[in-house]
Amino acid sequence: LRLSEQGYLKRTADEVWIPDERFFERSLSDTSVVAGLPTFISDVAADPFMIDQFLVNKPSKTILIPVQGDSMINVGINDGDIVVVEVSSTANNGDIVVATIDEEFTVKTLGKKKGKPVLLPANDSYPVIQPKGSLKILGVVIGLVRKYGK
């Protein structure tokens, strides 16, 4: 009962206990880490933080997809990363999208060439993809999850 009152657990309609939003909280420091020269931190406080609330605007339309390959490394998407994708059949020029092109599944930047949509890699070792047949947008990449180490 106490975990329910604090927002960690909730009951479903069929009386099953499941995790509620606060169950997934992590601590977020209110002090940023400097990526340049080190700075002195005298006291680091931490506030509750939920990754889903930070990354996901539309939970029912958001999926996670593992990345294989290195065609997007120049925009920071590496092999083994997980892209957070908001499902949508449309995207804007310049959006990083997950798409199917000629029955192939890929993550690339949506662009235009001679008025027609193309998929742009972020690695000079890969060519621009110009659809010979169909291009279908599955969704737009809105975030990224990466694990370091083991």
Regions found by a protein language model. Name each.
Residues R2-N78, G143-K150:
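Short, positionally conserved secondary-structure boundary motifs
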Residues K58-K150:
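Acidic/glycine-rich C-terminal interaction modules and beta/coil loop segments
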